[in-house]
Amino acid sequence: MNDNKIRIVILEEIYSICRLEKNDTIPDDITKSNFYSITSSPKEISLVCEQKFIRDGMKIEKDWKVLKIDSILDFSLIGIISKISTILADAKISIFVVSTYDTDYVLIKKSNLEITVRVLEENGYEIIKY
């Protein structure tokens, strides 16, 4: 990998973004997802997980692909998500971002995958598809 090129890995599975009420129970199956995120705020719980683990009764946005920034991002690094989000915004692609301690994940609608790959590659990103 070129040291100046950021590698992005597209996870194989299809994902959903779900909203639960604050007092709802989080389904146990979610932890079986290859990638998942649980975020709690004073008013809601947001879940990101493989689509096959969602259940009836959730408010759901289906058919998302996950793009993983394939490196450990030091907290001193600035602008990684800003650059990616600007490129995708210029292409009229909506995103949902999840960050972990080590790296960032950008979710895009599955229907936008082809154009997302194209514009990111045109802007110097290395895209790995699984």
Give the positions of each predicted feature.
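A generic structural motif
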Residues: 44-49, 103-109
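Regulatory modules associated with amino-acid/nitrogen control
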Residues: 1-91, 115-130
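A cross-kingdom feature marking solvent-exposed beta-strand/loop segments within repeated
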Residues: 91-106, 112-114, 130
